[in-house]
């Protein structure tokens, strides 16, 4: 059983190979070396063996001008050989295009052939077919055997390559025609000679200029050496004078220079201190204490106040700290904007802050709403909602009252996210903790609105 070298599909060998006799298969396998050895030679005479040439000379001398017919010693499958031809199994002679091939002797059966005709002919034939496929694979770039589908794909690939090469050849031919049709005046020999002479003259001028510059450089080098020598003499003379009559004057000069340098350094230090103080003063003047105390930021996921995040899947310790900062910010804004809260009192106590909900004037009862949680659920009137839901709704109501005060002070201000305390919604998202991901967005919207009000309060003061 043979398999395709490309897709590994089982193959059915063609009947031309299945029905081939031992002599035909031996001819295919034995001619491999002779063909490969003769390929690199260029002389056609070298391709003909010496015995064939001698046979040709002998035939020409004997005057045999009759055509030589091909004697087929290979049996066809399902047909008998013709009685008109010599059926000798010893040799065959072929005349093709004026080239005479020597009789091909039928060699003694090899071990493989005898094994094929013997008790196990299938294994010998398979071994011979493997040799034939190896010869075909070594001669080309494609491995054999190959199924019909892979062969058709290979042929299509070669056709595409041929078409591509044909188009490339046409492009080159078109470009060559354009070059031939180009105006000959652009490439006249006289113009080339003129440009060549100009280039040679320019090269000579550059060489002459180079020599002039080199001469000038040598002159400058000589002057430099002379000046260096003079400088050395002056230095020696100056050293001699310093060692005698100018030593005291130079010492006094150095002392005065040192004193001046020290005073200049002190002046530079004082100027630097003055600039630092001025910069610090300008920084303090431009410092916004509101945003410094309450740093509110928001990214794609969470809102933050002073580095503490608010939202779903945030640790409760961090959420409690953030809510405490929000309560402190609300108290600060109420004092700055003179907001009088209705029915609420804010109690900032860090991560355990509270909102006290006051009843009507006649009833002095109050309800303490803890603005912190440990994720413990309470069963009762709130339909298993978290205790923090009521506190968050109260905080949203406080923000709504602060917004109303700001709008009363300046009607042109509009917060980015709409507040609906009756529906427990800000910016279209529920403020309830149990809303999970919506609570994250609503907390971020809450902080953004607080940041806008804080900016407005800082601009008023």
UniProtKB/Swiss-Prot annotation:
This is Autophagy-related protein 6. Pfam families: APG6, APG6_N. Residues 75-94, 101-124 are annotated as: Disordered. PANTHER family: BECLIN 1 (PTHR12768), BECLIN-1 (PTHR12768:SF4). GO terms for biological process: autophagosome assembly; cellular response to nitrogen starvation; late endosome to vacuole transport; mitophagy. It comes from Meyerozyma guilliermondii (strain ATCC 6260 / CBS 566 / DSM 6381 / JCM 1539 / NBRC 10279 / NRRL Y-324) (Yeast). One of its GO terms (molecular function) is phosphatidylinositol 3-kinase binding. Belongs to the beclin family. Residues 194-286 form a coiled coil. Keywords: Coiled coil. Residues 75-88 have a biased composition (Basic and acidic residues). Residues 103-113 have a biased composition (Low complexity). Required for cytoplasm to vacuole transport (Cvt) and autophagy. Also involved in endosome-to-Golgi retrograde transport. The gene is ATG6. One of its GO terms (cellular component) is phosphatidylinositol 3-kinase complex, class III, type II. InterPro entries: Atg6/Beclin, Atg6/Beclin_C_sf, Atg6/beclin_CC, Atg6_BARA.
């Amino acid at each position: 059983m043979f398999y395709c070298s490309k897709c590994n599909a089982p193959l059915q060998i063609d009947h031309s190979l299945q029905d081939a006799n031992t002599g035909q298969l031996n001819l295919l396998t034995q001619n491999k070396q002779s063909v490969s050895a003769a390929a690199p030679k260029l002389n056609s005479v070298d391709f003909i063996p010496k015995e064939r040439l001698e046979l040709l000379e002998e035939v020409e001398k004997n005057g045999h001008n009759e055509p030589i017919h091909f004697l087929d010693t290979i049996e066809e499958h399902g047909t008998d050989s013709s009685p008109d031809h010599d059926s000798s199994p010893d040799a065959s002679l072929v005349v093709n295009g004026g080239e005479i091939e020597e009789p091909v002797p039928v060699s003694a059966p090899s071990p493989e052939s005898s094994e094929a005709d013997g008790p196990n002919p299938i294994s010998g034939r398979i071994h011979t077919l493997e040799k034939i496929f190896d010869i075909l694979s070594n001669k080309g770039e494609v491995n054999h055997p190959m199924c019909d589908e892979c062969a058709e794909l290979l042929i299509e690939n070669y056709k595409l390559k041929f078409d591509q090469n044909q188009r490339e050849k046409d492009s080159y031919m078109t470009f060559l025609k354009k070059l031939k049709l180009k105006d000959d005046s652009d490439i006249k020999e006289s113009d080339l000679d003129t440009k060549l002479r100009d280039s040679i003259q320019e090269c000579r001028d550059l060489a002459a200029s180079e020599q002039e510059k080199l001469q000038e450089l040598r002159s400058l080098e000589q002057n430099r050496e002379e000046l260096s020598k003079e400088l050395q003499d002056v230095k020696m003379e100056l050293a001699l004078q310093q060692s005698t009559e100018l030593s005291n004057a130079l010492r006094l000069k150095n002392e005065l220079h040192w004193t001046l340098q020290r005073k200049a350094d002190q002046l530079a230090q004082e100027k630097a201190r003055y600039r630092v103080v001025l910069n610090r003063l300008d920084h303090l003047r431009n410092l916004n204490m509101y945003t410094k105390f309450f740093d509110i930021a928001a990214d794609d996921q969470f809102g933050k106040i002073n580095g503490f995040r608010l939202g779903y899947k945030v640790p409760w310790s961090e959420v409690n700290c953030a809510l405490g900062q929000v309560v402190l910010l609300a108290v600060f804004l109420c004092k700055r904007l003179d907001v009088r809260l209705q029915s609420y009192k804010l109690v900032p106590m860090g991560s355990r802050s509270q909102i006290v909900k006051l009843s009507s004037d006649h009833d002095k009862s109050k309800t303490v709403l803890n603005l912190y949680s440990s994720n413990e659920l309470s069963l009762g009137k709130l339909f298993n909602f978290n205790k923090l839901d009521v506190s968050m709704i109260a905080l949203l109501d406080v923000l709504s009252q602060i917004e109303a005060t700001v709008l009363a002070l300046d009607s042109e201000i509009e917060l980015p996210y709409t507040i609906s305390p009756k529906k427990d919604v800000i910016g279209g998202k529920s403020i309830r903790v149990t809303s999970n991901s919506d609570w994250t967005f609503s907390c971020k919207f809450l902080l953004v609105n607080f940041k806008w009000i804080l900016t407005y309060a800082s601009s008023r003061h």
